[in-house]
Swiss-Prot record:
The lineage of its organism: Eukaryota, Metazoa, Chordata, Craniata, Vertebrata. This is Plakophilin-1. Residues 161-270 are annotated as: Required for WNT-mediated nuclear localization. InterPro entries: ARM-like, ARM-type_fold, Armadillo, Plakophilin/d_Catenin. Signal peptide: none annotated. A component of desmosome cell-cell junctions which are required for positive regulation of cellular adhesion. Plays a role in desmosome protein expression regulation and localization to the desmosomal plaque, thereby maintaining cell sheet integrity and anchorage of desmosomes to intermediate filaments. Required for localization of DSG3 and YAP1 to the cell membrane in keratinocytes in response to mechanical strain, via the formation of an interaction complex composed of DSG3, YAP1, PKP1 and YWHAG. Part of a complex that contains DSG3, PKP1, YAP1 and YWHAG; the complex is required for localization of DSG3 and YAP1 to the cell membrane in keratinocytes. Interacts (via N-terminus) with KRT5/CK5, KRT8/CK8 (via rod domain), KRT15/CK15 and KRT18/CK18 (via rod domain) as part of intermediate filaments. Interacts with VIM (via rod domain). Interacts with DSP. Interacts with DES. Interacts with FXR1; the interaction may facilitate the binding of PKP1 to PKP2, PKP3 and DSP mRNA. The modification Phosphoserine is found at S4, S119, S120, S122, S143. Belongs to the beta-catenin family.
Length: 727
């Protein structure tokens, strides 16, 4: 007796324990290039001296080498949309001068090899006699991001101390006989390496509007520069700090001084020392310095505000204790209050950098969402994006691109929390602004803009469990279809074949789209899908590619009509399969995993089988033939590839036979025996069982010396109970 090929294999419950969701993490290679604080300072001194020799009258500018960064640099082009004063060629290093004669601080990349993260400190460029005192640079922004291993629903959370693997996965299931669907969550935030960029003289730091490189205006730190514009009697320069013999205890005492310049000296010293010495953070904490710095955020003097914000940013970096203490001292509320009322770009950079650092700790997320989200959205995100709904109450003041970058980095972390995700979806104008910014960048061919990555990761996170958490038109159609099916099936013992709800493919039309989507409606709109695919086809940034694929993966991960509709929209209407297939050729295993998981979700829908067979099947089978299996994502990649091949093979056995090779079959057999990749081994066993049951493909197995007894040995009684019952 000839047995027909298995169209479905194994019941729903067989997949209950499968681990199929994935997490987004930076590549291991990029995380291994850590440098010590001493090495960074030496590099900064060398670069400063080199520029001093060539341009003695120009202020020195910090330059940090780009060590394997996933960014090409921090010089990003911005078109003039949204706000007329936005820079069209933005440099990380803004021009600035110390109004008291001593150097201000520069944002400097700090790479932590052990904790798998990129982030930035605020560092003093010139401190002590060994540094040339010729330049003053403005404070940079910071981020403090990493990952947590054990987190509900396989979402990566930004905890500071974690297992390098940093993943936990929990599958949600598709229909009977199909691979479990895969929800993705990407939250991790990164900062890139930094390069010095020239500026034209006389251009305000946050208002540059030329695309050509511009030069930093020459500045000099003289001993008689005033403390602030209104306090000419208070003067200080770097020599005063240099000769003061400051220590951490004395700097903390300075914070309580009635003299504002002493307050600033103490804060700047703490900021600088915490960049160099991790132990200084604990010392400041023990001396009660955090409380005093929080109090200084209320100072009427902007220089003191900036110094205090920069010191707090460095203090909380990589220190959960200091983060919690900052919250306990009401630091979050004070920082948000200052951000709401300040008009200083440099203070905004420091504050948004501080909030970004704080957002990496779970315990602070709820308060940050309640306190910081409204200010970040209304004062930074919405104004900078250019989106407008006619609400004149929102701020339309110029926003610096770096402030926007920091704000989106903070939201990138906050969107990983359940309460944050729901609040952001419901916040008027937020999703619209993020989508508008991404679309504008794609239209302007700025797909590798550093803020695009943050925006895409926020949109990726907001699409997580969208079908279950947000009332969509798909859910209403499903509800109507189920009711209609129930009514018809209750009238008799037989029902029309067209009324059956098989494999979640319901006989009902797809919902009509809103011509002008708003809020969460954007997340599943065809314009958003088109934007993701265009970005996927143009961007060279791995993290951006992964976020695009992850957002689409979330949209196709449900068990209902939305998954089918989104899959058909991606594969048929928008013709996005070639872009997804390109991801499988990436040298970054995170990107490959995202693409393979997305294809696995889409392969559950028979309407796509033919087009997937011609456009992606060869690439997927190549994964099973040539994938080395030596990356942390290999198990996920191979499991997804097995499920995709299995689903397509059931509809297209003849085409599958053309692409199956002896080496691929051998790899699948070897994968079944793998004890280190249980999920991939289970997927390979199911694929083998379907191959054996197919008359077109059984011969390939026999040519490799494979027989039915070997299949039973490899698969085991539990995983092949449905298969063996057919013989």
């Amino acid at each position: 007796m000839n047995h027909s090929p298995l169209k479905t294999a194994l019941a729903y419950e067989c997949f209950q324990d499968q681990d199929n969701s994935t997490l987004a993490l930076p590549s291991d290679q990029k995380m291994k290039t850590g440098t010590s604080g001493r090495q960074r300072v030496q590099e900064q001194v060398m670069m400063t001296v080199k520029r001093q020799k060539s341009k003695s009258s120009q202020s020195s500018t910090l330059s940090h080498s780009n060590r394997g960064s996933m960014y090409d640099g921090l010089a990003d082009s911005y078109n003039n949309y949204g706000t007329s004063s936005r820079s069209s060629f933005y440099s990380k290093f803004q021009a600035g001068s110390g109004s008291w004669g001593y150097p201000i601080y520069n944002g400097t990349l700090k790479r932590e090899a052990d904790n798998r993260r990129f982030s930035s400190y605020s560092q003093m460029e010139s401190w002590g006699r060994q540094y040339p005192r010729g330049g003053c640079t403005a404070a940079g922004a910071g981020s403090d991001i990493c990952f947590m291993q054990k987190i509900k629903a396989s979402r990566s959370e930004p905890d500071l101390y974690c297992d390098p693997r940093g993943t936990l996965r929990k599958g949600t299931l598709g229909g009977k006989g199909h691979k479990t669907t895969q929800n993705r969550y990407s939250f991790y935030s990164t900062c890139s390496g930094q390069k010095a960029v020239k500026k034209y003289p006389g251009r305000p730091p946050s208002c540059t509007s030329r695309q050509d490189p511009v030069c930093v205006p020459p500045t000099s730190c003289t001993k008689d520069l005033s403390f602030s514009h209104s306090r000419a009697s208070s003067k200080i320069c770097s020599e005063d700090i240099e000769c003061s013999g400051l220590t951490i205890p004395k700097a903390v005492q300075y914070l309580s001084s009635q003299d504002e310049k002493c307050q600033a000296i103490g804060a700047y010293y703490i900021q600088h020392t915490c960049f160099q010495d991790e132990s200084a953070k604990q010392q400041v904490y023990q001396l009660g310095g955090i409380c005093k710095l929080v109090d200084l955020l209320r100072s009427p003097n902007q220089n003191v505000q900036q110094a205090a914000a920069g010191a707090l940013r460095n203090l909380v970096f990589r220190s959960t204790t200091n983060k919690l203490e900052t919250r306990r001292q009401n630091g979050i509320r004070e920082a948000v209050s200052l951000l709401r009322r300040t008009g200083s770009t440099e203070i905004q950079k420091q504050l948004t950098g501080l909030l970004w650092n704080l957002s990496s700790t779970d315990e602070l997320k709820e308060e940050l969402i309640a306190e910081a989200l409204p200010v970040l959205a209304d004062r930074v995100i919405i104004p900078f994006s250019g989106w407008c709904d006619g609400n004149s109450n929102l701020s339309r003041e110029p926003v610096d691109p770096e402030v926007f970058f920091n704000a989106t980095g903070c939201l990138r972390n906050l969107s990983s929390a359940d309460v944050g995700r729901q609040t952001m979806r419901n916040y008027t104008g937020l999703i619209d602004s993020l989508m508008a910014y991404v679309q504008n960048c794609v239209a302007a061919n700025r797909c590798d803009d550093k803020s695009v990555e943050n925006c895409m990761c926020v949109l990726h996170n907001l699409s997580y469990r969208l079908d279950a958490e947000v009332p969509t038109r798909y859910r209403q159609l499903e509800y109507n279809a189920r009711n209609a099916y129930t009514d018809k099936s209750s009238t008799g013992c037989f029902s029309n074949k067209s009324d059956r709800m098989t494999n979640n493919n319901y006989d009902c039309p797809l919902p009509e789209e809103e011509p002008n989507p708003k809020g969460s409606s954007w997340l599943y709109h065809s314009d958003a899908v088109r934007t993701y695919l265009n970005l996927m086809g143009k961007s060279k940034k791995d993290a951006t590619l992964e976020a695009c694929a992850g957002a689409l993966q979330n949209l196709t991960a449900s068990k209902g009509l939305m998954s089918s509709g989104m899959s058909q929209l991606i594969g048929l209407k928008e013709k996005g399969l070639p872009h997804i297939a390109r991801l499988l050729q990436s040298g970054n295993s995170d990107v490959v995993r995202s693409g393979a998981s997305l294809l696995s979700n889409m392969s559950r829908h028979p309407a796509l089988h033919r087009v997937m067979g011609t456009q992606v099947f060869p690439e997927v089978t190549r994964l099973l033939t040539s994938h080395t299996g030596n990356t942390s994502n290999s198990e996920d990649i191979l499991a997804s590839a097995c499920y995709t091949v299995r689903n397509l093979m059931a509809s297209l056995p003849g085409m599958a036979k053309q692409h199956f090779s002896s080496s691929m079959v051998n790899n699948i057999i070897n994968l079944c025996r793998s004890s280190t990749s249980p999920k991939a081994a289970e997927a390979a066993r199911l694929l083998l069982s379907d191959m054996w049951s197919s008359r077109e493909l059984q011969g390939l197995l026999r040519q490799q010396g494979f027989d039915r007894s070997m299949l039973g040995t490899l698969a085991g009684a539990n995983s092949l109970r449905n298969f063996t019952s057919r013989f």
